[in-house]
């Protein structure tokens, strides 16, 4: 058993358009809305209970509350169910109400009280003037018929306004889709522009790197020029040194020639000295012969002295002269020997000095020749390195010129593309601004139209309410009711119910087809069997920050 305290839960279901009186033997339509966050199930049901009933088992009849397919837990859903005529309670003074019971047996909402009663006969009549014809004629029709016609006209006008509203909302949706498409295009253009800006920045950085490389190459070129100038100065210095070495070589050659001349002179002097020595040797040989002859003579004289001792005194004078001559010959021989030794020493010293000078001169000539060869090789290596540096410099200069030209062409092309993108971006921004203005105008027009529709709906709702109150208050003549089929309804009420059901369906379609406009629920209570006013959805205010 469920207590009555469960009838009003925190998140309740709102029942709409509950009439105080329902006609028996006719279908009853129940409209309700489920709140945000409510979990719906196919096992939920709506029942008709007596007001004083406390248990959910004591229901008169029930139908399953099937949720719509497009509904969700995060939205408010407007639903309706129908109770067939043959399941409804009998007419009387007993009060009933609708209860929404979920799958767990909890009551999630209940409606206002109502009763089932027979309709009263229509006793009131309305007098109408015939405006179409020129005759003065009065038409007397039942007030219910007149009000029914007025209700049909109002419903037709309201349906037309709803169709116009739907058309405008579809147009607004198309405009919003177009705006979203243009915004996506603009975003793509902005992304491409951003990528091109990054490419331009990359190219600028590359250009800066190229400029830095060019400056570095310029510095290297300046260093190479300084090195070339330095090498040229060194080459000039080496040329001067080579000229000096050539001069020294020429002086050495002159010295060599003079030494050779001296050598020739010394050779001549040596030849003369040799001749003189030979002459002196001949003289020494002659003197030796003379000495030998003198010695022979001395030996003969000594023999003669031995033999002729007595002739010693006589020949003493001859002996003295001979001794003096011998002494002179010895002195001359000693002088000649001394002269010969001096000449030989001088010859040997001259020959040694000449060989030393010749050897030193040959060594100096070889050293000078080696130095000249080394200088020539160094000159050739310097010329080759200078030629290689010149060729390398020319190659670097050509490469630098080619890279500079290519980068200049690429930079000009990127600048041109950047200018085109900037102009395209300006055009896109202008189109975006124009679309914003168009959207603002459309939204303002939609707001004004919504306000007009709200006003018309309120007016129609008030008129319909008044009409329905007047219809329910009328006492029509007794209408024939066919009880053969419990599903049949009275003709007038069936026509009104069908028209009001069409209006309700239009309102339901409008509510379902407008997901972009959040609605505020208004609990509207009018007479049954069908609702007159629907849940209106005001358009959201345009937020300029969403752009």
Swiss-Prot record:
GO terms for molecular function: transcription coactivator activity. It comes from the Eukaryota. Residues 473-498 are annotated as: Disordered. One of its GO terms (biological process) is positive regulation of transcription by RNA polymerase II. Belongs to the CALCOCO family. May function as a coactivator for aryl hydrocarbon and nuclear receptors. This is Calcium-binding and coiled-coil domain-containing protein 1-B. It comes from Xenopus laevis (African clawed frog).
